[in-house]
């Protein structure tokens, strides 16, 4: 088995960008969902499922520079932490974020048609489950077969896609450790999914009917699950093409 895709977004909800490698620390992928947008009126982190047009934008954080590409503008600079914090709701969990000064909030407010604030999050603060997520090509192929149209890896927004022939091998990884490149992770649980998985990863418009397919064959405790999440137990760099090793497997 090997890593066939790696990716993340530096701004929660923006387009999930494929990358040649990902650096993992004990807090998770470096640069992943480091920033988020906050709705100051409602006191909560902006939700992708309610704002799918965010996928029409990309956010890259490289060497301290945040570059956001919107349909009609590119906004780039070094984010300035203001020292002002906001404690807001993130899917029923209270998180404390630091407000960021710069042009990004204005650009996104104009794009979304509502006032938003850009904030910086701590590691894992605006991640629904554990910091790393995995899917397998075998599982994506099975979901595509059931949907009747190809499901793109980017629709599932996972940190890593692992190439496998059989579907849902990842179910057997729960509670086990995996080696990926220089890093090691421990798989925690299956990932509950929402209708974001059916959106076109570049436009945010409806593309597939995967959630309904999961409801038919991947229902667990009232949730529709696909892929697994994991914590990092050993930091390191993971490249596309790196071998994936299951601890204890022959």
Q: Positions of the model-derived regions?
A:
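Metal-cofactor-dependent catalytic cores
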Residues: 1-250
């Amino acid at each position: 088995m090997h890593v066939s895709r790696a990716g993340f977004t530096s701004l929660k909800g923006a387009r999930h960008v494929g990358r040649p490698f990902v650096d993992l620390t004990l807090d998770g992928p470096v640069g992943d969902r480091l920033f988020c947008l906050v709705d100051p009126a409602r006191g909560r982190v902006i939700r992708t499922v309610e704002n799918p047009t965010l996928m029409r934008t990309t956010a890259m954080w490289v060497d301290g520079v945040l570059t956001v590409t919107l349909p009609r503008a590119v906004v780039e600079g070094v984010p300035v932490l203001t020292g002002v914090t906001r404690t807001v709701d993130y899917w029923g969990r209270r998180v404390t974020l630091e407000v960021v000064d710069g042009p990004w909030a204005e650009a996104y407010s104009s794009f979304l048609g509502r006032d938003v604030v850009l904030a910086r999050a701590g590691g894992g603060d605006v991640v629904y489950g554990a910091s790393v997520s995995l899917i397998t090509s075998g599982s994506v192929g099975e979901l595509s077969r059931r949907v009747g149209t190809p499901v793109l890896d980017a629709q599932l927004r996972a940190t890593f896609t692992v190439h496998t022939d059989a579907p849902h091998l990842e179910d057997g990884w729960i509670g086990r450790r995996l080696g990926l490149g220089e890093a090691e992770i421990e798989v925690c649980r299956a990932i509950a999914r929402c209708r974001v998985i059916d959106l076109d990863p570049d436009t945010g418009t409806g593309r597939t009917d995967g959630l309904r397919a999961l409801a038919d064959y991947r229902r667990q405790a009232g949730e529709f699950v696909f892929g697994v999440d994991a914590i990092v137990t050993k930091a390191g760099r993971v490249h596309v093409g790196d071998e994936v090793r299951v601890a204890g497997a022959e």
